[in-house]
Structure formats: structure tokens, C-alpha cells
């Protein structure tokens, strides 16, 4: 099904003379779509179908095993992308294994919202305004972040 979508998007973008970058995603690892012993082969097979359909890159969500990463990267015909995941080695090591892009995924907002929830609970419990000035950015720093 995804192949048909990729083909349609590629065909439409080509017809409109739009240089579109298509990053195909699979959740073989994230959702354990096949038994563990079959995941590498299934992932490689999906990559082959997606590249034939017109995908430019391949994102494998939930992939953290270095042996699997290296095997997949060496067998597919497009760049391999992974997301930050528990147990995943640092970006430099991933590059040596063949990974071309490391995404933060939902890690940054998940971490941020954990801190927000903890701060809100402490503030509601204590009513201490000092909490709002500890470890925070100034208004000027915030403005600078959002001024491009």
C-alpha cells in the first residue's frame, strides 16, 4: 500500500515539476510487525520496494540494534535514517554503521513535557514563584530563539 502512495506522490510531483524529497518510513521494529528473527529481512525488502516506488530515503522507527543497523544500511539502495532510541549509540558511531540521518523523534518534546509537568506540580503544591525563575531563559533569549 505504501508503495502505491509513494509512486503516486512521485508521479504527481514530477508532473508538476516539483523536486520532492520522499522519506519512506517503516514501523517493522517500532511495532514488531514481524517476529524478531525476520525484521532485518523484512526491513530490507520494504526498502527495496520503496526505492523502486520512488523514495529517496528510508526511516526505520525503533531500530536500535547495531548489527541490524549495519546490515540494513549495507543492503539498501538509499540512505538509512533512524530516530533517537534507548540503547542507540551516539551519532558518530551510527555514521560508521551507515546511518545518514539521526532524528530526535519525539524525545525532545517528551523530555520537555516531563519537566513542564514536574514544574507545574511543584508550583501548584507550593505556590512558590521562585520556581519560575530557576533554570529558565530570559525573555530576550526566548525572543532570539524565535527570530529567524
Task: Report each predicted region and the residues it spans.
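Extended, intrinsically disordered, low-complexity segments
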Residues: 11-12, 107-148
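Alpha/beta enzyme core
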Residues: 1-104, 110-118
Amino acid at each position: 500500500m505504501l508503495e502505491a502512495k509513494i509512486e503516486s506522490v512521485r508521479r504527481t510531483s514530477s508532473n508538476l515539476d516539483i523536486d520532492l524529497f520522499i522519506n519512506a518510513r517503516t514501523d517493522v521494529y517500532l511495532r514488531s510487525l514481524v517476529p524478531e528473527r525476520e525484521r532485518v529481512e523484512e526491513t530490507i525488502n520494504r526498502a527495496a520496494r520503496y526505492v523502486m516506488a520512488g523514495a529517496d530515503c528510508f526511516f526505520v522507527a525503533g531500530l536500535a540494534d547495531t548489527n541490524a543497523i549495519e546490515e540494513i544500511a549495507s543492503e539498501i539502495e538509499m540512505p538509512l535514517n533512524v530516530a533517537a532510541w534507548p540503547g542507540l549509540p551516539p551519532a558518530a558511531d551510527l555514521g560508521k554503521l551507515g546511518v545518514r540521518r539521526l532524528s530526535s523523534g519525539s524525545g525532545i518534546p517528551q523530555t520537555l513535557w516531563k519537566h513542564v509537568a514536574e514544574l507545574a506540580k511543584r508550583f501548584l503544591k507550593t505556590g512558590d514563584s521562585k520556581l519560575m525563575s530557576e533554570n529558565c531563559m530570559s525573555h530576550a533569549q526566548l525572543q532570539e530563539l524565535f527570530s529567524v
